[in-house]
């Protein structure tokens, strides 16, 4: 993943992170559905969404641990 494509979660607020997590989970659901019905042509989007979700969840966990 190129440096310009990486998600910079350090600049996001907690609310924005939560919203992005919800959006990314919905995107993964849609991609899984497309894959199951063999309509998914851009398979790289699946990996990108999983990586983005992992980054967001990690940032959310780090912030919750640092706030307590």
Swiss-Prot record:
One of its GO terms (molecular function) is structural constituent of ribosome. The keyword Endoplasmic reticulum does not apply. GO terms for biological process: translation. It comes from Prochlorococcus marinus (strain SARG / CCMP1375 / SS120). The keyword Ribosomal protein applies. Belongs to the universal ribosomal protein uL29 family. Keywords: Ribonucleoprotein, Ribosomal protein. One of its GO terms (cellular component) is ribonucleoprotein complex. This is Large ribosomal subunit protein uL29.
